[in-house]
């Protein structure tokens, strides 16, 4: 349920399975439904295939072999890794003539009295308010076992995000989710200081829209 209070009155629905989607409109008591008009200026029909059992939200096993299920590294990397893992979400959004997949991270700030859902992603994913408004995020979209891939319970948030900033040079973008983060999500800490050469680094992401994965390497100074 969402109040359409935006100036443009637009609302992007969550992605749903099947060929039909039902939309219910709730009006205040005493308000006639006669003048209400609904338009669908854009539709995104996500194609599925037999490999994914014709389910649009799977994409299981689509990533490269250097990525392992995020749950596999919990014992090795500990609590800090688990917190960072729980801050990462799968993304779908509409841009130009298609729907795309990316990864984003929920960020913390220094105000301990609030939990503002700052959301960091890539500039090449979202670089305008028009695209940010179409954002859906998928939380805890990961395997419940190390092997085989087994999609557990996840939460989908719709309603989009407010676009705050992006930079093509750094390929970064900052958004603010219009819905609060779901239960179980974490707010990731961050540090703007440069990494030392050969520092171990870990990428927690949804490559090719796959389940949450982690890959590892070392920081290399560009020359």
List where the protein language model places each region:
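Short, surface-exposed tryptophan/glycine-enriched loops
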Residues: 2-20
């Amino acid at each position: 349920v969402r109040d359409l209070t935006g100036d443009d009155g637009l609302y992007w629905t969550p992605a749903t399975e099947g060929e039909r989607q039902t939309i219910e409109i709730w009006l205040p008591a005493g308000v006639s439904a006669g003048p209400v008009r609904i338009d669908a200026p854009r539709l995104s029909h996500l194609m599925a295939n037999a490999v994914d059992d014709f389910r649009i939200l799977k994409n299981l096993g689509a990533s490269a072999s250097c990525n392992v299920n995020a749950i596999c590294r919990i014992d090795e990397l500990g609590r800090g890794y688990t917190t960072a893992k729980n801050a990462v979400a799968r993304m779908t959004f509409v841009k130009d003539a298609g729907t795309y997949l990316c990864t984003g991270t929920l960020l913390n700030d220094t105000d301990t009295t609030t939990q503002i859902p700052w959301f960091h992603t890539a500039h090449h994913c979202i670089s305008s308010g028009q695209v940010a408004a179409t954002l859906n995020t998928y939380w805890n979209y990961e395997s419940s076992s190390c092997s085989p891939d087994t999609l557990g319970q996840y939460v989908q948030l719709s309603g989009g995000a407010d676009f705050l900033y992006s930079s093509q040079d750094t390929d970064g973008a900052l958004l603010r989710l219009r819905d609060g983060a779901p239960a179980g999500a974490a707010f990731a800490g961050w540090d703007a200081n440069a990494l030392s050469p050969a520092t171990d680094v870990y990428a927690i992401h949804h490559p090719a829209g796959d389940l949450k994965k982690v890959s590892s390497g070392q920081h290399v100074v560009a020359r």
